[in-house]
Amino acid sequence: MELAQTLSQRQTMQMAGQMLHSLAILGMSSQDLSEHLTEQATSNPFLTYRAPPAFIARGGEDFDAVAAVAAHKPSLMAHVVDQIEMAFTETPDRLLALRFAEALEPSGWLGQSLDSIALAAGVSLSRAESMLAVLQGFEPTGLFARDLSDCLILQAREADILTWEVETLIRNIRLIAENRLSDLADLCDCDIGDIPEIIKQIRHLNPKPGLAFDHQPTPVFPPDLIAVRGAEGWTVELNRATSPTITVREDRFADGTADAKARAERRKALAEARALAQALERRGDTLLRTAAVLVARQSAFLDKGPAHLVPLTLEDVASELGLHASTISRAVSGRMIQTQTRALPLRAFFSRAVSTQGGGEAVSRDSALDFVQRTVGGEDPQNPLSDDAIVTLAERAGLRIARRTVAKYRSTLGLASSYERRRAAAAR
C-alpha cells in the first residue's frame, strides 16, 4: 500500500513537471525555443534537432544552431514591435504605431511623410503627430526621425547637449561638408574658432541608429502563424519557416551499456526526449487552435479594420477551447500573425465590451475608440460634433454607444470638447 502511494506521488510530480515544461515551451518565442531545443539536443543523446528554415544558414544543410544563436542580432522591426507591445495597451494605438514601424527605413528614419501615414491609418494629422512624439522616445534614441537633423537633435536632447548653437549647427550641417565654417559661425552667432568645439560635441551622435540591427527583407523571426483569406473565409496555418523539428531516437537506447545505473539514466533521458516532443506538438496545436478562434471571431476586423472588432477576451477564447485563460495568454504573448497585407500582433484581436445606449448589443472598446477618433478627425472644424451628435452617428453606423462612453473615449484620445474645438478653430 505504501509502495503504491509512493509510486502515485512520483507519477503526479512527474506529470506536474511535464505540464510546467509544456507551458514554458508554449510561452517561448521562436528564438527562445530554438535556443532551448539546441541545448536539449546537445545534452540528450536521444534527440536530434532540425532548425526551422528561418534559422538555417545559407551555407548548406549543416546548421550550427549554437553559433547562430550566439551571432544573433535582432531585426529593427522586431526590436520596435517589442517596444510597441510594452508601450501601448489599446489596439488602435498599437495598429497606428505599427503603421509607423512599417514606414521605417534601415537607417531608423521614417521613409514616409506624416501626412501619408495618417492617411493610410485613417487618423488625423494631429493624432499622428502625437503618436510620433511617443515613438521618438523609443530606444535607441533617433528612431522615427524624419531626417538627419531630426535624428541628431533627438540624440543631442537625450545627451543634454542641445544648446541653441548645437541645434543651429545641426540644422545647417550641410555647411560643414561644404567647408563654409564662416557662414556657420554667423548663423551660430559665434567666432569661427568655436565651430570645431561645437562639432566635437555632436561627433559621437549616431546619424543612423537603425543600422545597429539586422536588415533582411523579412524580420529575422517571421510570424509564427499565417492567415489566408479564401473564397470561404479565413484559414490559419503554422508558419513552417519558424516551426522546428525534433526527432526522438528510440533506436539509440539499445546501444547503451549494461550498467544498471547508466541504463536508468538513459531511460530518464529517453523519457525527457519523449516529453519534449509531446510538449512541442502541444505548443503547435495550441497556437493553431487559438489563432483559428481569433480569426473566426474577428474576421470583420481583418476584412474592414479596427472599427469592426467585436468584444473578445482571453476568457472567451479559453472557454471555447476548454483551456485556462493563462494558457491563452501565453499563446498570444508577443506573437504575430501574417496576413496577405501585413503582420499583426495576436493581442490586437482582443477587445473589451463598453457601455451601450439602452442596453443594446455589446460593442468592443476598440471599435468605439476607433469610431470616435475617425468621426472627430473627419468633422468640419468650424462646426465640431457634440458628444450627442457622435452618439447619433454611431447609431446610424450600427454602434449603440452611451454618451458617457463617447465623452470618456474622447478624453482618452486627447480630444477636446466640441466647445473647445470650436474655439481652437476660430483662433486659427
UniProtKB/Swiss-Prot annotation:
Residues 313-332 bind DNA. The keyword DNA-binding applies. One of its GO terms (biological process) is nitrogen fixation. One of its GO terms (molecular function) is sigma factor activity. PROSITE patterns: SIGMA54_1, SIGMA54_2, SIGMA54_3. A motif (RPON box) lies at residues 402-410. Keywords: DNA-binding, DNA-directed RNA polymerase, Nitrogen fixation, Nucleotidyltransferase, Sigma factor, Transcription, Transcription regulation, Transferase. Gene3D superfamilies: Homeodomain-like (1.10.10.60), RNA polymerase sigma-54 factor, core-binding domain (1.10.10.1330). It holds the Pfam family Sigma54_CBD. One of its GO terms (cellular component) is DNA-directed RNA polymerase complex. Sigma factors are initiation factors that promote the attachment of RNA polymerase to specific initiation sites and are then released. This sigma factor is responsible for the expression of the nitrogen fixation genes. The open complex (sigma-54 and core RNA polymerase) serves as the receptor for receipt of the melting signal from the remotely bound activator protein nifA for the expression of the nitrogen fixation proteins. PANTHER family: RNA POLYMERASE SIGMA-54 FACTOR. Belongs to the sigma-54 factor family. This is RNA polymerase sigma-54 factor. The gene is rpoN.
